[in-house]
Amino acid sequence: MVVWVGTSFKMNKTLEEALAFARRLADADLERDPRVQRFVIPSFTAVREVKRVLTESSVKVGAQNMHWEDAGAWTGEISPLMLKDCRLDLVELGHSERREHFGETDETVGLKAAAAIRHGLTPLICIGETLQERNEGRADAVLRRQVEAALRGVDTEAGEAPILLAYEPVWAIGVNGIPATADYASERHRGIAEVAKSILGRPVPVLYGGSVNPGNCEELIGQPDIDGLFIGRSAWSVEGYLDILARVSAAIDRSSPRQTASERKLP
């Protein structure tokens, strides 16, 4: 299987900074590992130009959010048609910062995921429990609810359309985040994959995000239930991103042939 490894810039990088990153990444394309699918998610002001720079490369480019409607009186929003007009490949949905600060709900994430699939965009759906939910022993129930809500609206129309899930425990995100242990993350991934496959009837890759760094990326990707990495600040310099990509390739070399958790756990 292909391992997905990418980064979102969040609200960082000017257009020129994003383009410098993209150009360096394009230059490194000949050295890419075909077992690893790379992706970058810049700010809205940079997506079109970053995609233009990376068009001839294997790197996929996405947006950090979108509305579920194609058009209308939604001031300040971006529609899936607009993202397709920028020739984007994927769209990040439901990040915990969107849920906490901008009123994103399980319902709206589901609407957006369905809209993304209708328009040929790969949804990268973020899920994760808070520290309180983890401490109360509710992590698995919260993750099940989030996965079911995100996929309920796409189960009949998804077909074989690509869908990605990103497990990002809220307590592991940000400058003060505490990375989940590889064992803890792997156990959560196993449950997430099983729920997703029970809905869609097929495997869905589950990426880990939450303080991924050069010191833990190899152990994380070495877990059989972790299908990729969604990196934050450790990949905001292109050198940092390329370093983690090299470490991921080395970890894959040391591991046996990979299957997704859902492929192993369910018939």
UniProtKB/Swiss-Prot annotation:
Catalytic activity: L-erythrulose 1-phosphate = D-erythrulose 4-phosphate
Pfam families referenced in this protein's UniProt entry, alphabetically: TIM
Any one Gene Ontology BP term: pentose-phosphate shunt
Binding-site residues, substrate: G174, S211
Keyword tags: Cytoplasm, Gluconeogenesis, Glycolysis, Isomerase, Pentose shunt, Plasmid
A GO term from the CC aspect: cytosol
Single GO MF annotation: triose-phosphate isomerase activity
This protein's record includes keyword Ribosomal protein: no
Localization terms from the record: Cytoplasm
Entries under InterPro entries matching the protein: Aldolase_TIM, TIM_sf, Triosephosphate_isomerase, Triosephosphate_isomerase_AS
Residues forming the catalytic site: H95 (electrophile), E168 (proton acceptor)
UniProt pathway annotation: Carbohydrate metabolism; erythritol degradation
EC numbers: 5.3.1.33
Keyword Cytoplasm in annotation: yes
Oligomeric form and interacting partners: Homodimer.
Function: Catalyzes the isomerization of D-erythrulose-4P to L-erythrulose-1P.
Protein family (similarity comment): Belongs to the triosephosphate isomerase family.
Name by which UniProt lists this protein: L-erythrulose-1-phosphate isomerase
Organism: Rhizobium etli (strain ATCC 51251 / DSM 11541 / JCM 21823 / NBRC 15573 / CFN 42)
